[in-house]
Amino acid sequence: MLEQMGIAAKAASYKLALLSSGEKNRVLEKIADELEAQMESILSANVQDVEQARANGLSEAMLDRLTLTPARLKAIADDVRQVCNLADPVGQVIDGGLLDSGLRMERRRVPLGVVGVIYEARPNVTVDVASLCLKTGNAVILRGGKETYRTNAATVRVIQKALKACGLPEAAVQAIDNPDRSLVNEMLRMDKYIDMLIPRGGAGLHKLCREQSTIPVITGGIGVCHIFVDSSADIAPALKIIVNAKTQRPSTCNTVETLLVHQDIAERFLPALSKQMAESGVTLHGDETVMQLHGPAKLVPLKPEKLDNEFLSLDLNVVVVENMDGAIAHIREHGTQHSDAILTSDMHNAARFVNEVDSAAVYVNASTRFTDGGQFGLGAEVAVSTQKLHARGPMGLEALTTYKWIGFGDGTIRA
């Protein structure tokens, strides 16, 4: 079954690569219209998924991610229309020029071909990824989590209806709607057909893809994010930043999970932190120094293994460090190269932190919550990459392209 999907996707990718920006935008507009017109069928499938997930004991946070409402589906359709407004990178000439040989060279952006995406209980990802892939002339094979397979199947049928209405192959967007987990392992070996694989899920999924995939894999989205409160930090704005980074949307990958506090500011800062976190409903997981704190916040002893994991909840590790060296060493040992920040009034320390912390996004006196395609001015994103090849940070449209070299001659031969 999967090989046939791969063959069809590869064939579809050749047709998509030839579409103009206007043609691709018309397809996206049609998809948005069909999502609204076929809302009832998608929501009906989603109700079944939610009921099954609740019966299986899925957490309330995960159920909320899984649930679609008319308003949420309308917002998803509007997001597709927003993709139409993004600049199309395909065909862009990156650089080039006339060589001494007389050959004129261009380096031009082109689609990747076929993108594979494996993701969990987020039905919006189906549409987000499909729209970004179509905008960049790529076909896509989607494998959502078992919790959303009815919703994903219904959504992809609607997208395929729009593709067909626009005269394009339905295989441009396909979903593996069989929840059998063994199909994931089969998908990971489809390098003959899939050009890039993006897993969006937990550490276990990422580890599986890195170890088993014969396809180039872009991993990321796991955010053990840190904020370092330097000795010169201004306490009032620092607290505002920490509250935003922890409480705005705790379940996201750009939420802060560990707060590192310079020992020289700890005595003044920690009581204010406790008061602010109590008001925000955050539980502090403190080291030995922090556990001596007497304040209103709920405080529990820090477990070392928690330093390497995402909470994705209103929980925050708090560790007192001796100096900047200690903060950087901690981030290198426990971070995931996602997003890390320093709060300081010392621009020398800020520059050092930016230069020495090797993460996809590094902030000075700002919240980690900004690591997002929309916030970066990239428009929508397909994922957040924490590796260095071939994309890093929020992956917008350009990250779904590669390039080719094109040489123009006039009977030109190599001497």
Swiss-Prot record:
Catalysed reactions, as listed in the record: L-glutamate 5-semialdehyde + phosphate + NADP(+) = L-glutamyl 5-phosphate + NADPH + H(+)
Record keywords, A-Z: Amino-acid biosynthesis, Cytoplasm, NADP, Oxidoreductase, Proline biosynthesis
This protein's record includes keyword Glycoprotein: no
Cross-referenced Pfam families: Aldedh
A GO MF term: NADP binding
InterPro entries from the UniProt entry: Ald_DH/histidinol_DH, Ald_DH_C, Ald_DH_N, Aldehyde_DH_dom, G-glutamylP_reductase_CS, Glu-5-SA_DH, GPR_dom
Entry-linked PROSITE patterns: PROA
Enzyme class, spelled out: oxidoreductase
EC number of this enzyme: 1.2.1.41
Protein name stated in the entry: Gamma-glutamyl phosphate reductase
Species: Salmonella dublin (strain CT_02021853)
Lineage: Bacteria, Pseudomonadati, Pseudomonadota, Gammaproteobacteria, Enterobacterales
Gene: proA
